[in-house]
Amino acid sequence: MGKYGDKKVVDLSEWGRPLARVITRFLKDKPVSVIQVTNFHLLLSLYSAWLIYEGNTVLACFLLIVKGVIDAVDGELARTRERPSHVGRYWDTVVDTISLIAVMCAFGSLYDWGIAFTFGMIFAILFQYSLFNHYSILMRALGSGDATSRIDERVRPVAHPWEKQRNVNILHFIYLCFFNWQDRIISALSGKGSKSLVFELTVSSTLGFGMQSLLIFGLALTQSLEYLPHLVLGVNMFLMVSVLLRSRL
């Protein structure tokens, strides 16, 4: 069964999922944990940020595409081994945010954005990711019944038998402190959505890292990365507003 069960939806951020599944099949019986995979794409992101800081943007942006594929492997590996993990999904959120901050700060340094503008870019992207995540969670619940991720994370989850409750509690607390506000704002802005959620998921999926990494790589190849703010604050914000408006019609 796919990520969204039997629902026929177009998730543009999932273009790398077939490759992620190939890697997952290779790792399934190897002594590699899901957390180790997550930590690897964190290191890859930090290395990409350093390359951007050094001005090697094409290689850096290509590695961000690779990072996006590896980012899909940890979830696929957990599903293949039938070991969903609260620790894993919370840690994945923390890692993605650290990666985003590092990469955007590197771009900010390279293009002299200034501190305020750089953090404005970071917050804009966080909200765009949160919108996509919001509809991805709803569609997974609607299509496959997957309830591992939740729209409202305020209730502390009970650890699975293969993970420690103490670790779940710590990462759940971190999530509530640093990330829950994004979910609550997006939930407040979003309406009930269309019956099938196809429009909302498809359009918001362009805001996911998988699709955004391709667009950013395209900007790097054409030496047009100075237009990155136009993508994030212009095109992406227009798509975000379109989804929010559609969800209320």
Language model features by range: what are they?
Residues 22, 26, 72, 76, ...:
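Membrane-spanning helices that line or support transport/gating and their immediate boundary helices
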Residues 1-18, 138-249:
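C-terminal membrane-associated helical module and adjoining short loops/tails
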Residues 34-39, 91-96, 201-210:
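Select subsegments of transmembrane alpha-helices in polytopic membrane proteins
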Residues 34-87, 103-104, 120-123:
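Membrane-embedded alpha-helical segments that form the functional core of polytopic membrane enzymes
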Residues 60-67, 116-125, 229-239:
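Hydrophobic core segments of alpha-helical transmembrane domains in multi-pass membrane proteins
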Residues 45-53, 103-107, 133, 220, ...:
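Structural signal for membrane-spanning alpha-helices in multi-pass inner-membrane proteins
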Residues 108-138:
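Alpha-helical transmembrane segments
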Residues 52-59, 109-116, 221-229:
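Transmembrane helix interruption/hinge and helix-loop junction motifs
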